[in-house]
Structures are given as structure tokens and as C-alpha cells.
């Protein structure tokens, strides 16, 4: 209460920020008359003037009023749109590295042009991040007209572009693209072998459109580049037969007494955490079945070391069969299991679940099982976007997640007031006892809207529910259009016309996000279709366009009279923000509109979190069948349940980040080392450091620290140096001839001998000739061990929670063991690189060049590379055949088959392998 009183007196933090920004808006508005008098060339020349002033040391903040005024004037001339004052407020918020919450229809795309232009003046590049390729291309073409007019270059970063096309896109002043593609380019840039193969030029400033979708909804799933691992097809098929033979344990036991279990069984399901667990009886049943199938020997248990992988397969099969359902979590298309995005209901073609889950679902559905993937490179969106020097974002719904944006990304949320106050009527939820009653009420509402001509947008949380509504509307003979993951290619066109008279549109969650629903229809989309119609001549096109403009204007007035766009939702999403996004489709720019949620006690959110409380209310009121409860207390109860889920999901994302921060620190070290190696003209300091460490470790195996001569194994050290390292050192003679010698002096002699042997090799071949070979050996060793390290971290992460049973803190244990694993990685690289460079036998510089090319070729020619990422559109790239065609996509480890000594050399020289590159091994 005290905080409310203080807010009324002093204003909120948001109010104070906006008050400061409005003073700057007054300065911008004061420049408008002055800039209107400039001709196009004079206005365009302002860009170079600003760039010169920035180069001379003037800050962007000082330039802001003039730069924003130039963009506004350019937009008036080119786009025929003038930035509203509230858009200026949003632009300032974005420039200051904050999140701007602007309601649907307030012109976020145009708002972004202000800070984008201002920050592009530095010449360091600005990235505008969107949720899908359609929006990236649309916005780049649309706003590109304005940027080009002002003398700025614009690039579009899309999947399947060549290296040269991507480099051109990134070298532009402003680059549009998706979060996935920006992230994958970063990973690929840290997998290349040549400096010229990188495409990005640094991460300066990013503006993330639909920032809540990218930084919140998709933050639990990292970007992963993976390649196929060992094939376990037969094992998946066999284990899939085990699950139907197991039974579920029904009921719930009292943890204190153990009483209350009505039906013993083999496994339990926790719907809240989306997990399945074997009971003690389940372990015994599974072991018996696996023994009968011949998969484990008699008397063996699932916890035997030899059966660890079997346990992995069994749990994957349990999850795939019991927790993941067709047409809800995935669909089967053309013999493939395609994941459905839980946030948008769209297909995520090319994305695959990890840990064998996808293969388990494929076995369940009887489709072809594809091999498991090994992670080659990975990063979370949290850690990728925190690499930018400055980050900001915009969305229609950020305030409910303001704490998470601040906590995880350090981003403050600024709520920008609308240009016109919304007239949308958000009606109370109606809760029914059963799903059937809920759908009957929703269909009745839809029919009433249709009969009076009011357009309706029906929101669902899954494809399955959208198809139920679809069938019910067909049964009622109500014409409608369906917008879900199965038709996402047409979604922008469908959404654009969802505001026309008598239009009924069914949409999964926020399908079509980024496209406005204009009352009476989007005339621009209709005009595009007319202009693309080759059967019409110019006169006919002009006549049709005039007719459409008149028709849409008339329909707009009619729809407003009827109450605007009606939103009908058939389920609450677990996030209030997603519900608000659906509501936000209606009432744009001061238009009328209304929304209503129809719920039942059988809905997942209600059943798990709020059902008992609402059910008791309905029973006390003795409500008859078909009657709904409609009260503020019910809506508040549901929102309370949503807050619980949001808090749990936040904890999950925060925990993921805490674990990923460990690998992120290591990733930074590895990537920095790779970049240093590629950028260095002389690698001898790095090689010398590795060699010194390697031979110190080797020597200490035979001559321990602070030991006496009697403890030394000099003969063993001499033999190892000679046999494994090709170094002849008469160490025993030197020790015998010396009056006294310490272990440190022995180490110095070994190091000196190693350095001399390497120096001889360099002198014979030439330092310049050896550098590229050293570079490739270093990079390949780092890459291969980094991939193994990622797999080791994955396995460590999966089982680390068990440390809690030993009274240890899992997170601290993970950090400790991950650090130890990283130390092992560095040791492995040190030893492998040193051994390769010390023992390689080379006769000429030409041989070295061929060897370097062969090593690099092995890293570039792998196929079956898979890109995994969460996305709204399902445009996740799965590259198999194209991997060898795209230079920046290719580095994924060795795919060269083993070559026989008498086989032709893979380098293409025509010589036998033993007479060509075989000499080097």
C-alpha cells in the first residue's frame, strides 16, 4: 500500500522515464519544419554528416533528436507514414537498450527504424532479429526503401544463402534475419578453418522483434548443430515392445504413511514436470521382460554398468509412448515424425528431440528410425544474445515477464502508451463442467457472430483442438478458415483477411504473429494479389484495385458498427502473456473489439492447477449441466494458477542458464583460442607453450617432482622419447657423467631436446611452410575434443541430480566436474597436437600443403549435419546433401573413410596413398 501511495506522488519508474523521453520528443518535433524544407539530396546528405560527427567523437545520444527527425521526414516522403510521438518514445527506449512494450497495431516495425538508423551511423552494423524468414524478408524490403533513401545499405540473412551472400548481408549497415540464423552463423563462424570463411563481423547492437517469444518462450531450447552418431535402430524397436507390457501405478501415496495407492504398477507419471518414473516393481518387470527378449543376461539388473545405455533407451521409450501424443506434441507427415511447437502450434520441420526421444517416438509410430545425433556446437539464446554489446527488444506483451528480462538479460521494460486508447471489451471467463459443454457454448457464440456478420478469431492451444473446432463448425455448416501448423505457408495471407465480414478464422495460439488483422480486410494484401495476376491488363487492374479499396473501406465501417473483431478462446495457455497476445489481436489502433475465454474443468491447466477449487465453487452453487460459472473470483483463480506455472517455468529457464553458464565460459575460451589461432601469422609461441607443457607432464611420469635419483626411471623415459616421440636423448649418460643433477635439470634437458628436434624440422621444411599445417592440426584437434566434451557435459548434466541423494549440491558438483573435464580436454589437445607435430615425417613443403588440405577436407566434407532450434515457423534447417555445398556450414568433423596403403590417395593426386599423404602418418 505504501508503495502505491509513493507511486501516486512521485510516479512510477516507467512514468519518470517517459517524462524524460517526452522532452526529447519536443526537440524532435521542433526540427520537423526545418527538415521539411530540405530536398531529398539534402536530407540524404544528413546521413554522411552524422557519420562524420560520430567518427569525430560525438555521441549517439547527442545526435538522437536530429537523427530521429531525419528518419521521420524520410518516412513521410517514402513510406507515406509519419512516426507518432509514442513511436518516438519507443525508439528512444530501444536505443537505450530496453524492451519497449507496444500494443498490437502500434507500428513496432516503423518504430524500430529510429534506433536502427541512429546506431547504424557507427558503421559497426545493426541486427534486426525477427521470429521467421517471412517477417525478416518483408521488413527488410518494406523498411529497406526508407533506409536506402537515407543512404543506408540493408542486408537479409536467410538460410541456404552462400557464404558470399551472407558476408554481403552482414557487411551492410543494417541486417535483418531470424534469431536462429544469427545464432547458427555465430556457431558456424567458430567452426571454420579460414579467416575469410567467417560471415559475421562482430555483435554490436541487436533489436529483437517479438522479444518475449525469442528470449522467453524459446529460451529452454538451445541452438544445436549436430551430426549423426551410432545407429541403434534395432534397440529402439525392441525396447518399444517393452512399454505396452508395463502398467501404470494409479493413485498417490501419502509420503508419511505410504498409504493411498489403489493400484500398484510399474511406472508413475508426473504431469506437472512432464516426467515418467519406473517403480521398484517396474524395474523388476522391465528386467524380466528384457531377459526374456535376450537383451540382458540372467540375473543382470538395469543398473549394471553394461546396461546403462539400455536404461537410457527404456526411459526414452517410456517418455515417447506415455508423454508425447500424436497431433498434440507431433504429427506424422510423409513417414516422418514432425514436432509441433508448444507455444505456437506450428510444425518445426527438421527439428528433432534429443536423448533418443525422437527415435523412440519413431519406433512407436512405425516410421523409419533415423540415427541419433552427436552435438557439434551449441549455444542457448540467453548466452548468444548476451554477447551483443547492446541489446533491446519490442513486443506487445512484455510487462508480465519484466522481472525475467531484468534478471536474466539485464533488460528493463518500458511500457509505451498507445497512440489511441483501446476499446476492446475483455469479458470474464466462462467455465463449464465438461469439454462438450464448453465447445457447445463457443460454437453458439461463433454462430451468433456469423449471423450478424462480425468477424471471429478462434484461438486454440494445439492442432488437435483446432481440428475439433474445425469439425464442429463443418457440422454446423459455418464457413471458416483454419490456420495451424499444417498450413503455416499461407498464414500471413489468411490472418490479413481475418477481419472481413462474416469471416471465421481458427488459429493455434499466435500463428500469423507479425501480421495485423485489419477490420474490413487488409487492402494492401488484396492489391498485391491483383498486381500479381497476369491475366489482367493495366486498366483492369486499376479498376479492380479501386473496387477493392472502396469495398474494404465500407466493410471497415460495417465491422466497427458490429463490434469489431471478436476473439473466442477455447483454453487458457499456461502463460498469461500468450493469452494477452491472443486478445491483443483485437482492438488495434483504437478499433472496437471483444474477447472471451471458454474453459472447462477438463482443460489441462484447470485440471492440474485450478480444477479442484473451481469445481468446489460449482458444486456449492449446485450448477446444472450446460451452465457456466462466470465470476471475477474464478478468473483470478485461473490467473493465479498461471502465475504458478510461469514461476515454475522461470525457475526452469534460470536453472538451465546456471548450468549453461558453465559450458558458456568454456565455449568462450575455446572460441577465443580458435580465433587467436586463425588470426595469428606466427603460431610458434602457442606451439612452444603446448610442447613445454606436454614434455613436462611426460617427464614427471618418470622423474617425479622433488624426487631423488633412486626414484627415477631414466631408461623408461629414454625409451618413450625414442619410440613415441622420435627423440634420441642419451639421458642416462648425462646423468652418470654429472656430479649432481636435480629433477628440474632433467626436465630442462628433455625440454631442450624436444625444442631442438622441432627446430631441426622447422629448419628443414621452412617455418612459413609449416604454419598452415600447424594451424589445421590445432583447429582439428580442438574441434574433435570439444565435440567429445559437449557429449560428456550432456551425460554429466543428465545424472547430476542424483548427487543430491549423497547430500551434495548438484550445481556445485556439476561446476566442479565440468571444470575437471575441461582440464582433460585441454590436456588432450596439448598432447595430441604436440605428438602430431613432433612425429610427422615431412620431406617437402608441398607435402605439408597437401596434408593440410587433406585434414581440412576431412572437416569440410561431412554430411548428415542437422540444425536444431526452437522456432515459430518450423523453418529449422536440416541439412544433409547441402552440407558439403555450404562452406560455412560444413565443419563437422572427419567423414573420410579409412584408406588402405595401396589405395588411391583421397587428395586426388592419382598416387598411391603410401606414396602421397600416407608418408605423413
UniProtKB/Swiss-Prot annotation:
N-terminal signal peptide: none
Membrane topology summary: Peripheral membrane protein
Residues forming coiled coils: none
Record carries keyword Zinc: yes
GO biological process, one term: protein targeting
GO molecular function term, any single one: protein-exporting ATPase activity
Binding site for ATP: 87, 105-109, 516
Catalytic activity: ATP + H2O + cellular proteinSide 1 = ADP + phosphate + cellular proteinSide 2
Binding site for Zn(2+): 905, 907, 916-917
Keywords from the named record: ATP-binding, Cell inner membrane, Cell membrane, Cytoplasm, Membrane, Metal-binding, Nucleotide-binding, Protein transport, Translocase, Translocation, Transport, Zinc
EC annotation from Swiss-Prot or TrEMBL: 7.4.2.8
Oligomeric form and interacting partners: Monomer and homodimer. Part of the essential Sec protein translocation apparatus which comprises SecA, SecYEG and auxiliary proteins SecDF-YajC and YidC.
Protein family: Belongs to the SecA family.
HAMAP family: SecA
Record protein name field: Protein translocase subunit SecA
Organism of origin: Polaromonas naphthalenivorans (strain CJ2)
Amino acid at each position: 500500500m505504501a508503495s502505491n501511495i509513493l507511486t501516486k506522488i512521485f510516479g512510477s519508474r516507467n512514468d519518470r522515464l517517459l517524462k524524460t523521453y517526452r522532452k526529447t520528443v519536443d526537440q524532435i518535433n521542433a526540427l520537423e519544419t526545418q527538415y521539411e524544407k530540405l530536398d531529398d539530396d539534402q536530407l540524404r546528405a544528413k546521413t554522411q554528416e552524422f557519420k562524420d560527427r560520430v567518427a569525430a567523437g560525438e555521441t549517439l545520444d547527442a545526435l538522437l533528436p536530429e537523427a530521429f527527425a531525419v528518419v521521420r521526414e524520410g518516412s513521410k516522403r517514402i513510406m507515406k507514414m509519419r512516426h507518432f510521438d509514442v513511436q518516438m518514445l519507443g525508439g528512444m527506449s530501444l536505443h537505450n537498450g530496453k524492451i519497449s512494450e507496444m500494443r498490437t497495431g502500434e507500428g513496432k516495425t516503423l518504430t524500430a527504424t529510429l534506433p536502427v538508423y541512429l546506431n547504424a551511423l557507427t558503421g559497426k552494423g545493426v541486427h534486426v532479429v525477427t521470429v521467421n524468414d517471412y517477417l525478416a524478408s518483408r521488413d527488410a524490403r518494406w523498411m529497406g526503401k526508407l533506409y536506402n533513401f537515407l543512404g543506408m545499405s540493408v542486408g537479409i540473412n536467410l538460410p541456404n544463402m552462400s557464404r558470399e551472400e551472407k558476408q554481403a548481408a552482414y557487411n551492410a549497415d543494417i541486417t535483418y534475419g531470424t534469431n536462429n540464423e544469427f545464432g547458427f552463423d555465430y556457431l558456424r563462424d567458430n567452426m571454420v578453418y579460414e579467416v575469410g570463411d567467417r560471415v559475421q563481423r562482430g555483435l554490436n547492437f541487436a533489436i529483437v522483434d517479438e522479444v518475449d517469444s525469442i528470449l522467453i518462450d524459446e529460451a529452454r531450447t538451445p541452438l544445436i548443430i549436430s551430426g549423426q552418431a551410432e545407429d541403434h535402430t534395432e534397440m529402439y524397436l525392441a525396447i518399444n515392445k517393452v512399454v505396452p507390457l508395463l502398467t501404470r501405478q494409479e493413485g498417490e501415496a501419502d509420503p508419511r504413511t505410504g498409504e493411498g495407492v489403489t493400484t500398484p504398477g510399474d511406472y508413475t507419471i508426473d504431469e506437472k514436470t512432464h516426467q515418467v518414473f519406473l517403480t521398484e516393481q517396474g524395474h523388476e518387470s522391465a528386467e524380466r521382460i528384457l531377459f526374456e527378449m535376450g537383451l540382458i543376461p540372467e540375473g543382470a539388473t538395469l543398473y549394471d554398468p553394461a546396461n546403462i545405455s539400455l536404461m537410457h533407451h527404456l526411459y526414452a521409450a517410456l517418455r515417447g509412448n506415455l508423454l508425447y501424443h500424436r497431433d498434440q506434441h507431433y504429427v506424422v507427415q510423409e513417414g516422418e515424425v514432425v514436432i509441433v511447437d508448444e507455444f505456437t502450434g506450428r510444425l518445426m520441420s527438421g527439428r528433432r528431440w534429443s536423448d533418443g526421444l525422437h527415435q523412440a517416438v519413431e519406433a512407436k509410430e512405425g516410421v523409419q528410425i533415423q540415427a541419433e545425433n552427436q552435438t557439434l556446437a551449441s549455444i542457448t539464446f540467453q548466452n548468444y544474445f548476451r554477447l551483443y554489446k547492446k541489446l533491446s527488444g519490442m513486443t506487445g506483451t512484455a510487462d508480465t515477464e519484466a522481472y525475467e528480462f531484468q534478471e536474466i538479460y539485464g533488460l528493463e521494460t518500458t511500457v509505451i502508451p498507445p497512440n489511441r486508447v483501446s476499446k476492446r471489451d475483455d469479458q470474464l471467463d466462462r467455465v463449464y463442467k465438461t469439454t462438450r459443454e464448453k465447445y457447445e457454448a463457443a460454437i453458439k457464440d461463433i454462430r451468433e457472430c456469423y449471423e450478424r456478420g462480425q468477424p471471429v478469431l478462434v484461438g486454440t492451444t494445439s492442432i488437435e483442438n483446432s481440428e475439433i473446432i474445425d469439425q464442429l463448425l463443418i457440422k454446423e455448416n459455418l464457413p471458416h478458415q483454419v490456420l495451424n501448423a499444417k498450413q503455416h505457408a499461407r498464414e500471413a495471407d489468411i490472418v490479413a483477411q481475418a477481419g472481413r465480414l462474416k469471416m471465421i478464422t481458427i488459429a493455434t495460439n499466435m500463428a500469423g504473429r507479425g501480421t495485423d488483422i485489419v477490420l474490413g480486410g487488409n487492402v494492401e494484401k488484396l492489391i498485391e494479389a491483383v498486381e500479381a495476376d497476369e491475366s489482367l491488363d493495366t486498366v483492369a487492374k486499376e479498376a479492380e484495385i479501386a473496387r477493392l479499396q472502396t469495398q474494404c473501406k465500407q466493410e471497415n465501417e460495417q465491422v466497427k458498427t458490429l463490434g469489431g473483431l471478436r476473439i473466442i478462446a477455447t483454453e487458457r495457455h499456461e502463460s498469461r502473456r500468450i493469452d494477452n497476445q491472443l486478445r491483443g489481436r483485437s482492438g488495434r489502433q483504437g478499433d472496437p473489439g471483444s474477447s472471451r475465454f471458454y474453459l472447462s474443468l477438463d482443460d489441462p491447466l484447470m485440471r492440474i492447477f485450478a480444477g479442484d477449487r473451481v469445481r468446489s465453487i460449482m458444486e456449492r452453487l449446485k450448477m446444472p449441466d450446460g451452465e457456466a460459472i462466470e465470476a471475477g473470483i474464478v478468473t483470478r483463480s485461473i490467473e493465479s494458477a498461471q502465475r504458478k506455472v510461469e514461476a515454475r517455468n522461470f525457475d526452469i529457464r534460470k536453472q538451465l542458464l546456471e548450468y549453461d553458464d558453465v559450458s558458456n565460459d568454456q565455449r568462450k575460451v575455446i572460441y577465443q583460442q580458435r580465433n587467436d589461432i586463425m588470426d595469428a601469422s606466427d603460431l610458434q609461441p602457442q606451439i612452444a607453450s603446448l610442447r613445454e607443457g606436454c614434455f613436462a607432464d611426460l617427464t614427471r611420469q618418470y622423474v617425479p617432482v622433488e624426487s631423488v635419483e633412486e626414484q627415477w626411471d631414466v631408461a623408461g623415459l629414454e625409451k618413450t622419447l625414442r619410440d613415441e616421440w622420435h627423440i634420441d636423448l642419451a639421458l642416462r649418460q648425462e646423468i652418470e657423467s654429472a656430479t649432481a643433477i636435480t629433477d628440474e635439470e632433467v626436465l630442462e634437458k628433455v625440454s631442450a631436446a624436444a625444442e631442438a628436434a622441432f627446430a631441426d624440422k622447422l629448419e628443414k621444411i621452412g617455418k612459413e611452410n609449416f604454419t598452415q599445417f600447424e594451424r589445421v592440426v590445432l583447429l582439428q584437434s580442438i574441434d574433435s575434443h570439444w565435440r567429445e566434451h559437449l557429449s560428456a557435459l550432456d551425460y554429466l548434466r543428465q545424472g547430476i541430480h542424483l548427487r543430491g541423494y549423497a547430500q551434495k549440491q548438484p550445481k556445485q558438483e556439476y561446476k566442479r566436474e565440468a571444470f575437471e573435464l575441461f582440464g582433460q580436454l585441454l590436456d588432450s589437445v596439448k598432447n595430441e597436437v604436440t605428438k602430431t607435430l613432433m612425429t610427422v615425417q615431412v620431406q617437402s613443403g608441398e607435402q605439408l600443403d597437401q596434408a593440410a588440405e587433406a585434414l581440412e577436407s576431412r572437416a569440410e566434407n561431412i554430411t548428415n549435419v542437422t540444425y536444431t532450434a526452437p522456432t515459430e515457423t518450423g523453418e529449422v534447417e536440416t541439412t544433409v546433401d547441402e552440407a558439403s555445398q555450404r562452406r560455412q556450414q560444413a565443419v563437422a568433423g572427419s567423414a573420410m573413410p579409412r584408406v588402405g596403403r595401396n589405395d588411391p590417395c583421397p587428395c586426388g593426386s592419382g598416387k598411391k596413398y603410401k606414396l602421397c599423404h600416407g608418408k605423413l602418418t
